[in-house]
Amino acid sequence: MIGVRSEAPVFPPVENLTAPVLLAFFKINCPTCQLTFPYLQRLADRGGPRIVGVSQDDAEDTAEFKAAFGVRFETVLDTGYPVSRAYGLEYVPSLFLVEPDGRISWRSEGFAKADLEELAGRWGVRLFDAADRVPNYKPG
């Protein structure tokens, strides 16, 4: 997987950025993605960065996943996985924060509560509520 400070491979969601964008790579049948994506939507709802889901599945399955897990942020399809390969993905979910200068400033894979809290903190967002029962880490 490409690292922090690396130049992000370019594809439409990261072209001509004026603000950071969080890329969230996923597969619909991944239990860790199913855990993570509602919290990513919460991050978006509470004033976090623009988020773009990058689906490794087809349009119909992706739409069903979004409806089932309450995901409303933009998604794009990675048919044949060229973008996933360019980012060096080994696991999903994999998350990359791409800055307007085209560099990756943060990344995470799986469900890592501390990573997500750190990311949310960049926007002054409290991501997890006291009632949330989430693991500290769940691999993808």
Predicted features by range, described:
Residues M1-L17:
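N-terminal "domain-start" segment that seeds a small globular fold
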Residues A68-F96:
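Short, internal strand/loop/helix patches
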Residues I104-G140:
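Thiol-/selenol-based redox modules, centered on thioredoxin-like
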Residues T32-F69, V83:
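Structural microenvironment flanking redox-active thiols in thiol-disulfide oxidoreductases
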Residues E15-L35, L40:
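Short active-site neighborhood of thiol/selenol oxidoreductases, capturing the structured segment around
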Residues I28, D57, D78-T79, F111:
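Short beta->alpha linker loops
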